[in-house]
Regions:
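Cell-envelope/extracellular polymer assembly enzymes that use nucleotide-activated donors
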Residues: 63-66, 94, 254
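Long helical/loop segments within the catalytic core of UDP-sugar-dependent glycosyltransferases
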Residues: 37-40, 48, 121-144, 167-239, ...
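Short, well-formed alpha-helical segments that are part of the catalytic scaffolds
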Residues: 47-55, 74-87
Length: 428
């Protein structure tokens, strides 16, 4: 009979129903090592669904806003940012560009723009005092020359949409904040920008989740983005101004912590529809910029916690090497056996995750497939940053220790007549 014949053949082949029931169980068990690479999806979902946005903020006007732009050798970008600020729908405002002793045409361009619009003023920078880093010093000079009830510190390599300032002031008031900072859209144009920048920005986004920043009860959980910091003058003065962070490499992070210690409220929002910036334009600039900031900024993110500060190098290794485990395991196993299956699954999950990140950053999604290269490069930058930062950072004639405090001037070789090239991330 057909039924019995069928039954016999199944039994004879050794594929009993009991044996078949074990196959998927074994497969699922073998894939369990890949589960850690599902966790980032949960973090990404949380980040996407708890992201305060300037789009929700009301439009505001009224108080004079002093927009302060520290600039050193920014001739290629200064006109763009100035014109974008002047196109703001917010009224009233004044715009002060602090020329930090530029050797290019920055001052000339600003003078031309000032002749076109009376709201623009050029503030010639004074010599850098001992114990000060460039950007805090430029910001303080801009503050001293300003008249506004509100102060906006923004970078020269940013571009503002017309509603950015009005919505930012609206959010500052609606949230009752003493410091408003935003995350702009990060423009990634070249190959290395698109491969490496997502790795670093994800680490920052997970470390400083906006929901955590906005309800922070601990100093370690607050941050500010130096590309855009809006503060009432009264709150800024009460927190000690940028003078309180004059010797800090990560002056924006240190300023947020200073505000928190002073009992001030910080609000962080996404502004990807209203502001954009491009930090680096080459692999060399990217490596140099993050090498200076990554380790020292990581240590600064755990103020008064020496044990966690000491663990920063390990945190950087774990943060980037996490993504290298699946592809390395896949290469070693050739995809064979249980470990190979788990490695293949983990690699696939990681690739999907980074493709989603690329889409979120408006990068072609296929760059997500290159995540092992990005993670490896970021890991190398982290190692380089640790090596340099743990010893001494030399930048524009001064030395900085791991605490970020100036260790004094460096002797300059007589043959050196030019300053190092301007780094997009670095203070001017």
């Amino acid at each position: 009979m057909p039924w019995s014949r069928s039954s016999t053949s199944w039994s004879d082949s050794g594929c009993s129903s009991s044996a078949l029931s074990q196959v998927p169980v074994v497969a699922v068990t073998e894939l369990l090592p890949a589960l850690p690479w599902l966790v980032p999806f949960a973090s990404l979902f949380r980040l996407a669904n708890t992201r305060p946005s300037l789009s929700d903020a009301p439009l505001a006007e009224g108080s004079l806003v002093s927009v302060i732009i520290p600039a050193r050798n920014e001739s290629t970008t200064i006109e763009t940012v100035v014109r974008s600020v002047l196109a703001s729908t917010y009224r009233p405002l004044e715009l002060l560009v602090v020329d930090d002793r530029s050797t290019d045409d920055t001052a000339t361009i600003v003078q031309r723009l000032a002749a076109e619009d009376s709201r623009v003023r050029l503030v010639p920078g004074e010599p850098l005092p001992a114990g000060w880093y460039g950007k805090p010093w430029a910001c303080v000079q801009g503050y001293r020359a300003s008249q506004g009830e509100l102060l906006l510190f923004t970078d020269a390599d940013t571009r503002h949409q017309p509603e950015l300032l009005a919505r930012s002031v609206g959010a500052l008031r609606a949230e009752g904040a003493d410091l408003l900072t935003v995350a702009p859209r990060q423009l990634c144009v070249t190959f290395w920008e698109r491969v490496v920048m997502p790795q670093i920005w994800l680490l920052l986004a997970l470390r400083y989740h906006p929901a955590r920043v906005n309800r922070a009860s601990r100093e370690r959980d607050v941050i500010a983005n130096g590309q855009f910091i809006l503060v009432p003058r009264e709150s800024y003065e009460a927190a000690g101004t940028h003078e309180a962070v004059r010797g800090e490499v990560a002056e924006d992070l240190a300023l947020a912590q200073t505000f928190h210690r002073a009992g001030k409220r910080i609000h962080f929002a996404f502004a990807d529809h209203f502001m954009e910036t491009r930090m680096y334009r080459s692999l060399r600039d990217l490596v140099e910029g993050w090498s200076k900031n990554m380790y020292l900024g990581g240590r600064r993110s755990f103020p008064g916690e020496p044990l966690l500060q000491a663990l920063v190098p390990l945190m950087l290794v774990v943060g980037f090497a996490f993504w290298l485990v699946p592809p390395v395991a896949l290469a070693l196993t050739g995809g064979r056996g249980g470990l190979g299956a788990a490695a293949a699954a983990g690699t696939g999950l990681a690739a999907l995750f980074w493709m989603l990140i690329a889409l979120g950053m408006r990068i072609p999604p296929w760059y997500g497939l290159l995540y092992p290269l990005g993670a490896l490069t970021a890991l190398g930058i982290g190692a380089r940053s640790t090596w340099r930062g743990a010893r001494k950072v030399e930048w524009r004639g001064r030395a900085y220790t791991a605490s970020g405090v100036s260790a004094g001037p460096l002797a300059r070789p007589a043959s050196v007549s030019r300053r190092p090239a301007r780094d997009r991330r670095d203070p001017p």
